[in-house]
């Protein structure tokens, strides 16, 4: 009987994915003392040159979490592939790294088997984009493999839909059919095609999805960063699905400590928090589009005009398009800061978690990244949806149409090729968010309470995580 165990986590080299992998690792270690060590395999990629430094900063005070850096491969996929089809880039990166990953896992397993302690490697926890490793590493080394879905359960429903659709239509999605409604499993409503992830409309990225989607069925189990109370419909769907692995709702998995931007100084944080301290409760709208979300100068000017028109208090984190770091004030309309003096603050980086937790924040104009979505729900802050990339349109559709927890600003922003969102559109959404959303605000607050209860002893996510841990040790006892 195995008394203690080790897990090996394999995230893709992206800060958002690394963050939630490490947060989940911390939770597992805190929940069960029999989990002796969790090793994070850190892949090297030109697309995320600071991934290792970032990961080390997250585990600095965690002696039971180890980082195992893999050496850079000699022939990474071309970087222009990452820029035009990031899903295809990541899938190719994992394939090229597979021999290194297999060697590293083999070495860890061998060291445990040859050691004097009773610790054994119980399994692999793989990022959704690493699911080829279920067969190529897990099965080869006789290790149970679990896929960790860093997005929501409806995304898993989309992955279930793709192979069925591909058998009928063996090509990428077509934007000219944007209003065609798709019967995606796990959704209450049929989804207009235009709200699907933009990669599905790109031939190279679509081929990556077609590779990834069927492999979920090969896993021992699927861990989802969501919770039953937020997504009862898809979790119920998967619980009744035959010939499919068990799905564990283990979220929300959050980091409630802010990660500073490399260029951020303490004075920026102090200025932002100090300004918020002086604002009335729930009076400020926060605009922030994530680490990769940016807008061009004409769009900045439309947002500025809308904020002037609405007249509400605001905190606006600006990242402009382009390779050169721009001072936010350089792209604002002339005289804007003078006209909004006292009721608006513009910054580059913002401490998002601390901002969303602040009593002054009454609404969040967001890109709808899943980490940001969970943070806003955790702190009971309603959202206006402005998706920018990846699966964010699907998240926006979920929040607005499926759950009634958000205001639609422009749910199909990516599908509409980033066309200019007008001052009037933005103003309408901000007004609805700040002035007309009492019922929505109440629903979001109720979901914040549900998120906390899910993580308590006896809560839905706590019980699901316990089932996952029990399965690990059951497998380990038969090794």
From Swiss-Prot:
Q: A single Gene Ontology molecular function, please?
A: UDP-glucosyltransferase activity
The annotated active site, in chain numbering, is 17, 127
Residues engaged in binding an anthocyanidin: 17, 390
Q: Which UniProt keywords apply?
A: Glycosyltransferase, Transferase
Q: Where does UDP-alpha-D-glucose bind?
A: 150, 350, 352, 367, 370-372, 375, 391-392
**Keyword NAD included in the entry's annotation:** no
- What top-tier enzyme class does this entry carry? transferase
EC number from the UniProt entry: 2.4.1.91, 2.4.1.237
Q: Which reaction does it catalyse?
A: a flavonol + UDP-alpha-D-glucose = a flavonol 3-O-beta-D-glucoside + UDP + H(+); a 7-O-hydroxy-flavonol + UDP-alpha-D-glucose = a flavonol 7-O-beta-D-glucoside + UDP + H(+)
Q: Pfam families this protein is in?
A: UDPGT (PF00201)
Q: Which PANTHER family match?
A: GLYCOSYLTRANSFERASE
Role of this protein:
Possesses quercetin 3-O-glucosyltransferase and 7-O-glucosyltransferase activities in vitro. Also active in vitro on benzoates and benzoate derivatives.
What family name appears in the similarity comment?
Belongs to the UDP-glycosyltransferase family.
What is the protein name for this chain?
Answer: Flavonol 3-O-glucosyltransferase UGT71C4
| UniProt source species | Arabidopsis thaliana (Mouse-ear cress)
Q: What is the lineage of its organism?
A: Eukaryota, Viridiplantae, Streptophyta, Embryophyta, Tracheophyta
Gene behind this protein:
UGT71C4
